[in-house]
Curated annotation (Swiss-Prot), chains A, B:
Substrate binds at N228, M257, Y286, H322, S342, R343, G344, D383, G384, L385, R386, E422, Y449. InterPro entries: ThiC (IPR037509), ThiC-associated_dom (IPR025747), ThiC/Bza_core_dom (IPR038521), ThiC/BzaA/B (IPR002817). Keywords: 4Fe-4S, Iron, Iron-sulfur, Lyase, Metal-binding, S-adenosyl-L-methionine, Thiamine biosynthesis, Zinc. Belongs to the ThiC family. Pfam families: ThiC-associated, ThiC_Rad_SAM. [4Fe-4S] cluster binds at C570, C573, C578. GO terms for molecular function: 4 iron, 4 sulfur cluster binding; carbon-carbon lyase activity; zinc ion binding. Pathway: Cofactor biosynthesis; thiamine diphosphate biosynthesis. It comes from Methylibium petroleiphilum (strain ATCC BAA-1232 / LMG 22953 / PM1). Its EC number is 4.1.99.17. This is Phosphomethylpyrimidine synthase. Its cofactor is [4Fe-4S] cluster. It comes from the Bacteria.
Length: 628, 628
């Protein structure tokens, strides 16, 4: 079948709501401020509502046409601020899509296709002298709708959580250890404003991405995850890219980076942005390199600047900028085990060496800030010198760059430009905390955004696991967003299943961090699932899990019958004997007696004894094994 | 095809040596002391030798007949000690294999099959008054062949490791943080003896398991992993059990627990033990429960004792004994979120409640010690009250039991019985270290052996990942052995692929812990693989990884051609541009100049510049995407 049909088929799959789930909304202070949540209805009548990144795609009522894009929820908010202007925008060039000058025919076709693209529209920018960043508003004491949206979203529905956790955890042991984070009991819009004003959180939301459902990245908010997608001349189509996006946010990607290269990247980006409810990040140097035929030393500030404006006009929410790869640092990588492994970093290193000049990105950093604040593009200051192996972790090259990123953070903040800092990479467990400490020390609490880190080098094919270990730890220590790693890392291109595996592994890491930090309510979902498990509500256990489909499929491999979904046993212990059942018997007994359970246990022994004997005829039919 | 044929087919798969690998041996002080290693030959001529748990199965020359079992490497050592006697052994009963008394025909058939079993042989036990535990020898200053074997095995071939690491890591940052462990530069037989004498390590090696290749479990040795296997009346055959064992040790299981239940468990255990080069553990209460028809309250000391002797005679190397589930602790579980989730723990809880009496296992603990020391069966003191959910982690029920296990450890040591302590379970990250600290404090540095722990409850289908995070952390903190969790945990029976997934996840966790602890040489394999990666030696990268098959398959999905196995690029960056290649250019350039790389970088810039320009015609053909 042709590409559109194929896409339609894939989308029909990814648009299916999760089992027993429906979209609900938290109503904000204005009618057009509605924060989506996923409500899971349990078989005992309870409702659990969960943070939802999947956008309108999981709402059956909404008609989706990827050629028209998603509704622009933020447009009224932008209009009301009255500090932006719509303008013609930069003239699109065939080169933006990778067409070569000599390639006349391709250029003509590109142009035709682009002219026809319904998604094209004139961009906005800040009016002369205006600064339209969320940080700028925050510092002027303005609480934007984006900030209120984030506050509602971070809290979720606290009502059901209290049923499990109470207003505060019963015991100290369950309160978590925030490791220096200052997480409030309730996130208020004012708290969000203050965090953004301090630079401790960012809300990536380009004024040319009105489709975005605002979210925050910061140490005092829920830990977020990023998934990378990207086209490939040889392996995928533009339409497949949009489907990859929808697939990624279905499984919980809070942000997506479009790392496309080669042909059609400009158009690919248009389609992704117009159809994305989550912030989109890019690495502009990749496209700039395309424009100079892949010859790093031919890069110029003019070409790079033009690319930043091109992407800012399209609505990219954050740029990875490798401004810390400075000429004086490059020789520090010479005796590394694996040198420079960041593509952006190596591009700039090649440029610096070939010209024996300081990085033009570093030298033009304030010029870049001027572009960022005209569109509210956030900085993701890239770690171009991150370690590519355990042997290179925490070395001078890495930390010299980190200190520079700290200096640049203050420059960006001088312009009220939102900023986060990228981190490694490959780091053994004993060196992970030092990464967080150094980042906090030198980068003034700007959000940290790490790739993994991978705790060992010998797990190709399983690097999503080797890195989930490091990601969970650094997330607990204070990292605000975790960039996922798929099983294909170091080996090849992630396919649809690899993307899902990477995302689920990182949802585990991020949630483990939220629970350890003691984020209010984070553990409520665990309690709800464990309660369902204990009460043999199998469907509820599946439906509350990160991947209900897989949980149910695995269970059904051994016990396919629907009856077993309500049976008070599982395949591990068999029907006649179950450890959880015994505890329930103890508890029921205590309840009958109407006295404290502890007393009942003592007083009731004799009676209990005879009860058990009556059941003595049971024959224990074990079906399988369980640990200890 | 019939079972034997099926087994033969499966075995032929699992007997295939790993790619570019051959079995080699470290020769000990006596001709019959030869420690197996796996030698991987790299394409650059280097040889890397790795710890090998796979036994004779991966040596093509060795003829294997599962009906005859493996060679008894330890028999001469046992004979020389001259402190054991061969005796008739306990009379086998049909009930041992789960045949019911009323089931005459089944009983007859069982008996016939058992009489015919070539694997049956008279057991050994300590001569009257003798104590044959490794701890007993160690405390008398005797270095046994088992101890020397362990020393050679723990060191591995240090020669090749030095090529990467030098005698000591260049920099402090790479030396690891042992978190209180005292890991020597070289493990001597005397060090092993001392660790065993102190009780800080155990060598599980029943005198009736002469086929075992000795290994150590202790905080100052490499972190080990355990895989659980077990039959199931409905899902597998005895022969499949043996194949499961071979499959588990192929992927790196250091120990295997046979958690079989139901029919044929006695015979299954015989076959597993006679064919296992790794220590085998069991939970004897499971079989004892079979013998009383699954009615926990009908258990008696006589039945339990008889089962311990039955299994000790077969050669089981360690018993999980839930002696810490005491009557006074049971009520502490009543208001838990998930009560008692350990099967052994709940069996004993049911017994205590129904009789309103103290646990017969606790009361007869010293009688059990007498059995253990007559066969050198090690204790694995079970945590029957471990938490089954994050909400129950580190509660009083758990820690009350842990303190009791500490008391019992000293009782066991009074009898020179080797002992390790089992740990949880479900524990959020911020509570993991407290588990290790409490265990060290109350259990006198007896080896800790934990199940995970799982850091969150919401990942059914992915609990091998949710628990690998906790396992890696607690392994770093000092846990000696990690019991694996498979993707099927909480949902169903692990199949062949689940077992592999669980083992690889736990090899990652254990290796991450070894690297973080700074175990000498642990990081050498990472360096060798990263060097291969950096030098585009693809086959070496695959062959040094934990799962060469998967690494190669993933790579080949994108670049199947054999040519690309030596190509200086990968699918992530494409043929004309590679970040690692650039670093190599920088390094080569510096080398040519014959001056320090740092100087060369400065001095050589201008020249480098022109060189790069010559290559300017290159067109960058990107094939895919990579993170920033």
């Amino acid at each position: 079948m042709n590409a559109p049909d194929k896409l339609a088929t894939l989308l029909s799959l990814t648009r299916e709501p999760f089992p027993a789930s429906r979209k609900s909304y938290l109503q904000g202070s204005r009618s057009d401020l509605r924060v989506p949540m996923r409500e899971v209805t349990l078989t005992n009548g309870e409702t659990v509502s969960l943070y939802d990144t999947s956008g309108p795609y999981t709402e059956p009522g909404v008609a989706i046409d990827v050629r028209r894009g998603l509704p622009s929820v933020r447009t009224p908010w932008l209009d009301e601020r009255a500090d932006t202007e719509v303008y013609a925008g930069r003239l699109h060039q065939a080169l933006d899509d990778g067409a070569k000058h000599e390639d006349r025919e391709a250029e003509r076709i590109e142009q035709l296709r682009l002219d026809a693209a319904a998604l094209q529209r004139p961009p906005r920018r800040a009016r002369a002298g205006a600064n339209v960043t969320q940080m700028h508003y925050a510092r002027r004491g303005i609480v934007t709708p984006e900030m209120e949206y984030v506050a509602l979203r971070e809290n979720g529905k606290r009502e059901w959580m209290r049923e499990y956790l109470g207003d505060a955890p019963r015991e100290q042991r369950l309160r978590g250890n925030p490791m220096g984070a200052q997480i409030p009991a309730i996130v208020t819009p004012e708290f969000v404003r203050d965090e953004v004003a301090r630079g401790r959180a960012i809300i990536p939301a380009n004024i040319n991405h009105p489709e975005v459902e605002p979210m925050a990245i910061g140490r005092n908010f829920l830990v977020k995850i990023n998934a990378n997608i990207g086209n490939s001349a040889v392996t995928s189509s533009i339409e497949e890219e949009v489907e990859k996006l929808v697939w990624a946010i279905r499984w919980g990607a809070d942000n997506v980076m479009d790392l496309s290269t080669g042909r059609n990247i400009h158009t690919t980006r248009d389609w992704i942005l117009r159809n994305s409810p989550v912030p989109i990040g890019t690495v502009p140097i990749y496209q700039a390199l395309e424009k100079v035929g892949g010859v790093a030393e031919d890069l110029t500030w003019a070409i790079f600047r033009d690319t930043l404006i091109e992407q800012a006009e399209q609505g990219v929410d954050y740029f990875t900028i490798h401004a810390g790869v400075r000429l004086p640092f490059i020789h520090l990588t010479a005796d590394r085990r694996t040198g420079i492994v960041s593509r952006g970093g190596s591009i700039m290193a090649k440029w610096c060496i070939s010209h024996h000049r300081e990085s033009f990105i570093y030298e033009h950093f304030e010029d870049i800030c001027d572009i960022m604040k005209a569109y509210d593009v956030s900085f993701s200051l890239g770690d171009g010198l991150r370690p590519g192996s355990a042997a290179d972790a925490n070395d001078e090259a890495q930390f010299a760059e980190l200190r520079t990123l700290g200096e640049l953070t203050q420059v960006a903040w001088k312009h009220d430009v939102q900023t986060m800092i990228e981190g490694p990479g490959h780091v053994p467990m004993h060196m992970i905390q030092a990464n967080m400490d150094e980042q906090l020390k030198h980068c003034h609490e700007a959000p940290f955004y790490t790739l993994g880190p991978l705790t060992i080098d010998i797990a190709p094919g399983y690097d999503h696991i080797a890195s989930a270990i490091g990601a969970a730890m650094i997330g607990w220590f204070g990292t605000a967003m975790l960039c996922y790693v798929t099983p294909k890392e170091h080996l090849g291109l992630p396919d649809r299943e690899d993307v899902k595996q990477g995302i689920v592994a990182y949802k585990i890491a991020a949630h483990a961090a939220d629970v350890a930090k003691g984020h209010p309510g984070a553990r409520a979902r665990d309690d709800a699932l464990s309660k369902a498990r204990f009460e043999f509500r199998w469907m509820d256990q599946f439906n509350l899990s990160l991947d209900p489909d897989t949980a149910r499929d695995f269970h059904d491999e051994t016990l396919p019958k629907d009856a077993s979904k309500v049976a008070h046993f599982c395949s591990m212990c068999g029907p006649k004997f179950c450890s959880m059942k015994i505890t329930q018997e103890v508890r029921d007994y205590a309840a009958q007696r109407g006295v404290s359970e502890a007393q009942a246990l003592g007083a009731g022994m004799a009676e209990k004894s005879s009860q058990f004997r009556q059941a003595g005829g049971e024959i224990y039919i074990p079906l399988a094994v369980d640990k200890g």
